[in-house]
């Protein structure tokens, strides 16, 4: 770094070398400000999409689910079917399935 500075001082003089250094720092400053503006714009964009698209979309989906499929799933008859008529020995068991009759408290094979 000092070698480069000494070479610039010899070839261009102290005024131009100082001017080049100042212009270099000014360029770095402007690059930083441009990057800051870009990050701020990206942050505002993400905040906009999150506030106006993601949250309302999730709330809308939850609302629709709650008042359509959610109501249907909270049906006691459906729960009785799922609990009582599903094979008690799992999906992949080779043995015959065991079913339970809820009204008569009997097991069927």
Swiss-Prot record:
Would the keyword Membrane be found if you checked this record's keyword annotation? yes
| Biological process annotations from GO | disruption of cellular anatomical structure in another organism; viral budding from Golgi membrane
Q: Which Pfam families match?
A: IBV_3C
GO CC terms: host cell Golgi membrane; membrane
User: What are the transmembrane regions?
Assistant: 12-32
Q: Which UniProt keywords apply?
A: Apoptosis, Host Golgi apparatus, Host membrane, Membrane, Transmembrane, Transmembrane helix
Q: Main subcellular localization, coarse class? A: host cell
Complex formation: Homooligomer. Interacts with the M membrane protein in the budding compartment of the host cell, which is located between endoplasmic reticulum and the Golgi complex. The cytoplasmic tails of both proteins are important for this function. Interacts with Nucleoprotein.
Which family does the UniProt entry place this protein in?
Belongs to the gammacoronaviruses E protein family.
What's its job? Plays a central role in virus morphogenesis and assembly. Acts as a viroporin and self-assembles in host membranes forming pentameric protein-lipid pores that allow ion transport. Also plays a role in the induction of apoptosis.
State what protein this is by name. Envelope small membrane protein
């Amino acid at each position: 770094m000092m070698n480069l500075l000494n070479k610039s001082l010899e070839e261009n003089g102290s005024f131009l070398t100082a001017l080049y250094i100042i212009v270099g720092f000014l360029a770095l400053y402007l690059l930083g400000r441009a990057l800051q503006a870009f990050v701020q714009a990206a942050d505002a964009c993400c905040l906009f999409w999150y506030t106006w698209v993601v949250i309302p979309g999730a709330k809308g989906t939850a609302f629709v689910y709650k008042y359509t499929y959610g109501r249907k799933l909270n049906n006691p008859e459906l729960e009785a079917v799922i609990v009582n008529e599903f094979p008690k020995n799992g999906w992949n068991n080779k043995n015959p399935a065991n079913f339970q009759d809820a009204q008569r408290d009997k097991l069927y094979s």
